[in-house]
Amino acid sequence: MPSSASMSHHHSSGLRSSISSTSYRRTFGPPPSLSPGAFSYSSSSRFSSSRLLGSGSPSSSARLGSFRAPRAGALRLPSERLDFSMAEALNQEFLATRSNEKQELQELNDRFANFIEKVRFLEQQNAALRGELSQARGQEPARADQLCQQELRELRRELELLGRERDRVQVERDGLAEDLAALKQRLEEETRKREDAEHNLVLFRKDVDDATLSRLELERKIESLMDEIEFLKKLHEEELRDLQVSVESQQVQQVEVEATVKPELTAALRDIRAQYENIAAKNLQEAEEWYKSKYADLSDAANRNHEALRQAKQEMNESRRQIQSLTCEVDGLRGTNEALLRQLRELEEQFALEAGGYQAGAARLEEELRQLKEEMARHLREYQELLNVKMALDIEIATYRKLLEGEESRISVPVHSFASLSLKTTVPEMEPLQDSHSKKMVLIRTIETRDGEKVVTESQKEQHSDLDKSSIHSY
């Protein structure tokens, strides 16, 4: 693009310089030394060159429009001739004006070439943006819709997973609650059994104490009975000894008596002896039977007390074993209960954390969706702004195209005003101008873009241009 712009710039500048040099040679001829007769030729050609340069650019035509010949009246040139110094000064002024106009024309051509290059660059950007916009129109809404639908499906799937996980956790929680209630009920039953066992143990201890007291009392009774039996045995033995002594003494006496007494007395003594022996044997047998009965009763009572004591000890040991087993079971149930409660708290905390994470994820996805919507809205605003810029650029391009066509039409018009000019050899005599001020209407068009809408305002301005009297008097 820069090469084409530079080529167009060089072509237009070369064309204008060739036209200007050709019109200069046609009007003024080759640059020989000036003569007094060439003054009228140069002075008359100033108006034609002013017309030619007035068609070169809007600025030069606006600036040099005041030098056009007035509609009413014409300058009358006297027959006097100017001297060589005046022709020299006019020629220098004309050359300076021509050089300034050529420089301004060159600058305007450069600016115009830059504008053309900028317009081409903006047209390329506009075409690229149109392609991107068409691609974005064709793809991005569907893609954004697909992304939104996919994210919504993922969110729904995550919500379903969360719902199922929540239901599962609730079922587990209900099961754990039921297990906990059963364990609590079992713990209460075991606690009640333990209390009953402890109460029975207290009663058994009381019974054991009573049995111990009874046993001690019975042992004391047994000891007293044994002492009594021993005393009775001793008494019986003493009685037996006394009886034996008495019997022996009686036998001795009987022998002595038998020797002296009659046989009737011996028989009587023998009867008495037999009676006493029967009484002694009967007393001994009764004492032995009483002793045996008492001993049997005491043995039976001791055996009964011993059996009751043994049963009480056995029941006490069994109660102790039951209490120990129940205590161990209660401790185990307490540990299980604490573990279940801890697991329940951990599950609740984990569920709360997961729910918070899912809520944060849902909020993040909603925020991303909102950002995507904002970005889409921003892209649409940028696209609208680009459309506005494109519209403004199209308007500017059309304006520059019209200006360029007008300039080219002005340049291509053949110069006929040079032949109609009469070459005078006299110094012009100034007459009062009928219209010293020329009026010019200027159309000002302003193009603005407000809120995506193009606003075009036009205004007309009346411009007054005074003739340069010093320039006119210089003729």
Swiss-Prot record:
Residues recorded with modification Phosphotyrosine: 475
Region named Disordered: 1-42, 453-475
Phosphoserine PTM sites in chain numbering: 35, 57, 66
Modified residues (3'-nitrotyrosine): 24, 383
Region (Linker 2): 244-266
Post-translational modification: Phosphorylated; phosphorylation increases after nerve injury in regenerating neurons.
IF rod domain: residues covered: 101-411
Gene3D superfamilies listed in its UniProt record: 1.20.5.170, Single helix bin (1.20.5.500), Vasodilator-stimulated phosphoprotein (1.20.5.1160)
The keyword Methyltransferase appears for this protein: no
Reported function: Class-III neuronal intermediate filament protein. May form an independent structural network without the involvement of other neurofilaments or may cooperate with the neuronal intermediate filament proteins NEFL, NEFH, NEFM and INA to form filamentous networks. Assembly of the neuronal intermediate filaments may be regulated by RAB7A. Plays a role in the development of unmyelinated sensory neurons. May be involved in axon elongation and axon regeneration after injury. Inhibits neurite extension in type II spiral ganglion neurons in the cochlea.
This protein's name: Peripherin
Native species: Mus musculus
Name of the gene encoding the protein in the UniProt record: Prph
